[in-house]
């Protein structure tokens, strides 16, 4: 049953005043809010399911809020709600004694302690639209919000709305509850509780609290609570993130125990429980600050922001938090601006924490960011939570970090398309002992990726990188089944750093171009139309990189030392098609880099050489062992193009089969100039349809 708000009955006036605003304008805006709230309460009391606002423009002001009501939908019906504001003049509702009028703050629409409440179908405009920024300090203001989910609200939504121009965030989730125990007397003792009786027993590695009361006078009545963190990171200071909860009745009689409950998960309260005790594993210091908060009623959960356009937020677009909340299928644009600060002529927030979506200050668990279009912000998604799913978003034109992970336990970043972002994904330090990030089936065009923080285990698989600047991975990263492709020629040489890569492909579509690899191990990888330059990630030590079961098509496998110590190359059980191997030294003494091809299938169709020497210091080594070499090019010149310096090359051929496929035998040269050869070994090789040189 629907209720159409009767404007005159509730003292609501349609229409927006013009600046400069007078006190009467603010008073009417405040009456509008009161009238809407009274209409919502009337509808709820009379069993209406939906309240409809007559289509029009309506003024709002701070600090009074539109308060959403449980089990009631609020249909804005295409209306516009706008906050009227003057940075340079005091509002009649500003009770502060200071003259910094631009710091007068408020929220517009609030979901607080409600369930099944839905807002949809209109435009909500914040105070930034009216602000003058005449005082340069005004750019630091970050405390007004459009719609706010708070205090355990659940199963609520904002849908099909435009929300814009608030100083903090256009939409925000606050990870608070109906009632919190923060800093309180825990009465910690070094003991345990018996699982059968709930009574204390001796222990040397568990801490238990004293008997704690469950609040009975809260509205709505609480049926659950959760253990959250405290402080900036909100990950707690518990050695174990699991704990036991023992429940008791009003006479301290034991009811039962819930074992091994994780932080940030709801804990149901037994119907007759009045008290409880907590038991913490792997703890023995009764004076330790455990940094946890008990949140009665839980934090906002299972709420949704869907099919909204969220833009022009001064600091950011959406602050996400709570548990199981979703931001899905929205356009989130031009919030927390950077390079596009000129869009509306207003200055940007004075802190680099400007973003589209942020969970940095609203810790929670199991939130979802999915199917959104995100662009035009300084940062894209900043995530700090227990676990999060970031899936199927289109994120582009981000000035700095597209996705940045703060402290978290688990993140899945899946099936996203990122384009023209300076940094695609970044990692900060995790405060969990087993943090895991799964990056799968994404497409990254341009930008770089730095995942060197080893406090996470990171899996990257089935991703595509188009024209990346660089990808650098830490020791705890795996890089499997990824595809890197270059469709244009960048201004700098791209590079990748990893311990091991598996089943990955690397390709240049246009001209053969160079990519630097700081990788020790390759398994089942494919390289096409690239100069694959191996470089030692640790220039203080000689090292070897190994290519196993890999394939090179029209490549140059480059092992060139310009400084430090060499990264020698060993290729085994692989295919080389029209690929040359270059070994070189430029002005580095006392180093002897080498490249080895072992048990490989080598096909030469267009190249004139298998090896290239580019060295001015002795010496470089080229080894071919147990390989099958098929030559189809009648113009093939020599196995080794031996460069220009005297005595700087060593060529070793052992147990190979060489075959020329032409009709007449090929006149083969081992090397182009004997004077360039330091040492040559030709042992147990077979040559078919090939004329060998008379003098080796």
Residue ranges and their predicted role:
Residues 12-52:
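Acidic Gly/Asp/Thr-rich repetitive segments characteristic of extracellular carbohydrate-active
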Residues 33, 37, 47-105, 124:
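N-terminal extracellular ligand-recognition/capping segment immediately after the signal peptide
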Residues 62-64, 83-88, 128-134, 145, ...:
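Short glycine/acidic-rich loop motifs that flank beta-strands on beta-rich extracellular proteins
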Residues 70-80, 102-135, 149-166, 302, ...:
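Parallel beta-helix/beta-solenoid
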Residues 179-205, 212-216, 256-311, 370:
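Extracellular polysaccharide-targeting segments
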Residues 182, 199-201, 228-260:
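Extracellular ligand-binding interfaces
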